[in-house]
Regions:
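Conserved catalytic cores of phosphodiester-cleaving nucleases, focusing on short active-site segments
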Residues: 3-42, 136-140, 144-159
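Acidic-basic catalytic patches of nuclease active cores, encompassing PD-(D/E)XK
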Residues: 3-11, 43-55, 60-133, 235
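Surface-exposed cleft-lining segments at the edges of enzyme active sites
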Residues: 24-31, 109, 119-127, 155-163
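Short, charged, amphipathic alpha-helix that recurs within catalytic cores of restriction-modification
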Residues: 30-60, 161-181
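Nucleic-acid nuclease catalytic cores
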Residues: 47-71, 176-205
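Short, electropositive alpha-helical surface patch
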Residues: 75-86, 199-223
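Charged phosphate-binding loop/patch that engages nucleotide di/tri-phosphates or the phosphate backbone
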Residues: 105, 221-235
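Acidic, metal/cofactor-coordinating or nucleic-acid-engaging core segments within structured domains
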Residues: 108-124, 128-130, 169-193
Length: 235
């Protein structure tokens, strides 16, 4: 699992970009970066440069049943230090994300299971509900330069009836603000998931923009995949 995640405060203001990597035990112990990891990290570095938002690299071992600590990585030097989970909370707190813990705060175990990773259990429990956090799902490049960020949504709701849910507006607001800071286009892209046979139908896509100033989504267009990939859509 590799994620580029934007974290913000309770006002949906972007504060930190974090690359979260769940590695095998072999890569974790040897601090070896895969080609995919290097690509994701480099994209995060560029996003940090153009948005002005700091970025951090965090890696944990997905093969361990319990999570006590993570690798806190300096990408430039390829050096890292293992930090306990309560110390990681203080890193986030410096950016106004979550609650500042005391030096004597107990380090807990966080368990990996098939449903949810230990890292995300830690995030929910320690950083709390007064934050916003959202993955960067898809980035568009034109002439080797980033031009857009897309939030991907899917469900079994027919494409002509689906519209963004208000429960997701906080995340849309966070990512659209981040995209604005980076001078990138932001769109919500929906595809329908079929039940029989079970598959994601991406032959047709429905696009929405999101105005974080007015906290509302606006329908843009419904296009075939080829037109989407070539940027041929309204809005």
């Amino acid at each position: 699992m590799y994620k580029r995640q934007v974290y913000g405060n309770d006002k949906c203001e972007p504060k930190l970009l974090v690359v979260i990597m769940a590695s095998t035990r072999e890569h974790y112990l040897n601090l070896e970066f895969t080609e995919l990891e290097l690509s994701i990290i480099e994209t995060a570095r560029k996003l940090s440069d153009i948005s002005g938002i700091d970025y951090k690299l965090i890696r944990y071992c997905k093969d361990e049943s319990e999570l006590f600590c993570v690798q806190y990585i300096n990408y430039k030097t390829k050096r890292y230090k293992n930090i306990q989970m309560n110390h990681l909370a203080k890193v986030f707190a410096k950016y106004g994300i979550g609650t500042t813990l005391s030096e004597t705060s107990e380090t807990k175990k966080y368990l990996n299971d098939k449903i949810s990773s230990a890292f995300h259990k830690w995030q929910r429990e320690v950083l709390g509900n007064n934050i916003t956090a959202s993955d960067i799902d898809l980035i568009k490049f034109e002439n080797d330069e980033m031009s857009a960020i897309y939030e991907l949504k899917r469900s079994v709701v027919p494409i002509d009836k689906w519209k963004p849910y208000s429960d997701d507006y906080a995340n849309f607001k966070l990512i659209s603000k981040f995209a604005d800071m980076a001078n990138l286009e932001f769109k919500i892209v929906y595809n329908q998931r079929r039940k029989n046979p079970y598959c994601d139908d991406i032959s047709k896509l429905k696009l929405f923009s999101f105005d974080y100033r007015e906290n509302r989504s606006n329908y843009c267009d419904t296009v075939i995949l080829e037109d989407f990939l070539k940027g041929r859509y309204h809005g």
